[in-house]
């Protein structure tokens, strides 16, 4: 546990604490509990706050539970997808919910575990957040049709040569199926010309998003979050697809006029905004944080305040 405390670094921790500074009591939902770094800091600073922590990864949740021992009685941990669990919590707690945090990053524990398949050198080709899920990365890479691979590489990886990569993977797996993440990573490196990032980065991102239904879950959550009243919503994203969904949802929440854009005149009374966007531009890590934690470099945090 001491090793976890020293190695685990919660992204934008001080900025998250600042975002929730106005909260004094009520319920805060950490939709992506992970190892509990953000939750631990918030419970430490807010003695009257109650916490609901949600995570698909039961192993990570056990570690978080150990880290939160000092706050026994002030938190409740739930397993499962955060969109579904958040909806249930919202129905149960309603306006007692004063804050919601979503950190969409993969935890260091998952990235560094060679048995999980998230890194380029893993001995597995898995990438599941929920180890009880049926779909894993090996099934995607070795059994998806070429057309299906093209679609996820284009839509989830934003890969320019998505057709070429899908066809090369299909040709190679016909001779010899991919056995682990290192095998896939080495294969992609053998023909990719991308020098800015590791040749496997965007393919791994696309497959991980597919395996965990990440964008669908985020969309479902953002739709449900419209029903919050008087709460602060803080979302940390790590790539442009996530950030675009959050940015557009917040803009939609803040709209006063809900008339059809083709209308010549507003007839809706122009007062339908659900609240206020508190971050005109996303908050990003400081150079010092990036220096201390390279994995934080692509993080973007957006904050929205819902009206009571």
Swiss-Prot record:
Any one of the GO CC terms: cytoplasm
Quote the record's binding site residues for S-adenosyl-L-methionine.
36-38, 55, 86, 103, 110
InterPro entries linked = RsmH, SAM-dep_MeTrfase_MraW_recog, SAM-dependent_MTases_sf
Per UniProt, the keywords (alphabetical) are: Cytoplasm, Methyltransferase, rRNA processing, S-adenosyl-L-methionine, Transferase
Catalyzed reactions: cytidine(1402) in 16S rRNA + S-adenosyl-L-methionine = N(4)-methylcytidine(1402) in 16S rRNA + S-adenosyl-L-homocysteine + H(+)
One molecular function GO term is: rRNA (cytosine-N4-)-methyltransferase activity
For this protein, the record's Gene3D superfamilies field holds: Putative methyltransferase TM0872, insert domain (1.10.150.170), Vaccinia Virus protein VP39 (3.40.50.150)
Return the EC number. 2.1.1.199
Entry keyword annotation includes rRNA processing: yes
SUPFAM superfamilies in the record: Putative methyltransferase TM0872, insert domain, S-adenosyl-L-methionine-dependent methyltransferases
According to its UniProt entry, the protein's GO biological process terms are: rRNA base methylation
Protein location: Cytoplasm
Domain of life of the organism in this record?
Bacteria
Query: What family is this?
Result: Belongs to the methyltransferase superfamily. RsmH family.
Free-text function comment from the UniProt entry: Specifically methylates the N4 position of cytidine in position 1402 (C1402) of 16S rRNA.
The protein's matches in HAMAP family, at most eight in alphabetical order, are given as: 16SrRNA_methyltr_H
- Name used for this protein in its record: Ribosomal RNA small subunit methyltransferase H
């Amino acid at each position: 546990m001491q090793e976890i405390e020293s190695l685990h670094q919660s992204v934008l921790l001080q900025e998250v604490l600042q975002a929730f500074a106005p909260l004094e009591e009520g319920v805060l939902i950490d939709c992506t509990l992970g190892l509990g770094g953000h939750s631990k800091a918030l419970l430490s600073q807010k003695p009257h706050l109650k916490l609901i922590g949600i995570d698909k990864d039961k192993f990570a949740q056990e570690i978080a539970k150990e880290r939160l021992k000092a706050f026994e009685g002030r938190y409740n941990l739930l397993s499962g997808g955060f969109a579904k669990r958040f909806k249930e919590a919202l129905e149960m707690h309603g306006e007692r919910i004063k804050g919601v945090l979503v950190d969409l990053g993969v935890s260091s524990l998952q990235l560094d575990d060679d048995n999980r398949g998230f890194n380029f050198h893993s001995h597995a080709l898995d990438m599941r957040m929920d180890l009880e899920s049926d779909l894993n990365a090996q099934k995607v890479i070795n059994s998806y049709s070429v057309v299906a691979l093209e679609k996820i590489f284009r839509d989830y990886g934003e890969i320019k040569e998505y057709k070429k990569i899908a066809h090369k993977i299909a040709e190679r797996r016909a001779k010899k199926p991919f056995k682990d993440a290192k095998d896939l990573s080495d294969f992609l490196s053998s023909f990719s010309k991308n020098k800015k990032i590791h040749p496997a980065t965007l393919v791994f991102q696309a497959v991980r998003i597919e395996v965990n239904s990440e964008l669908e879950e985020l969309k479902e959550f953002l739709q449900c979050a419209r029903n919050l009243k008087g709460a602060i919503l803080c979302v940390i994203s790590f790539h442009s697809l996530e950030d675009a969904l959050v940015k557009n949802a917040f803009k939609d929440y803040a709209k006063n006029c809900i008339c059809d854009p083709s209308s010549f005149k507003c007839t809706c009374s122009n007062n339908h905004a659900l609240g206020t966007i508190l971050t005109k531009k996303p908050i990003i890590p400081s150079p010092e944080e990036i220096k201390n934690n390279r994995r934080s470099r692509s993080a973007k945090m957006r904050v929205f305040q819902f009206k009571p």
